[in-house]
Amino acid sequence: MYKRQPVHWAGRACEMEKINKIASEHNLYVIEDACHAIQAEYKFKRCGSLGDLGCFSFHPLKNLNVWGDGGIITTSNEDLANKLKLIRNHGLINRNTCVEFAYNSRLDTIQAVIARYLSLIHI
């Protein structure tokens, strides 16, 4: 399975109906880059929820930042969500069993607190 990655830019959404139709016809995942589209909508649905995965960056130069690098991925696909949960923590299914090579992709504590505070204020 391959992917297509539309990039929503400056709060303007891509033509997601067309993109999703093409992806469906060719058995592709749609991974949205919604970093510049916090709270932007396409046909009354939020950007980042229109494809298989939505990606948001917390980098200092993006619309929503947490004083350092970080990000979040959204999905309504349970299989992809389970895969992401696995790879976000070294591929571990428990303390002693690693089933896939992966990284530690969690925010540090300070960034998580800042992100939570900012989300309560702005979103």
Describe the residue ranges of each PLM region.
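Generic secretory/membrane-interface signal
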Residues: 2, 26-27, 63, 102
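Active-site region of PLP-dependent enzymes
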Residues: 37-43, 50-121
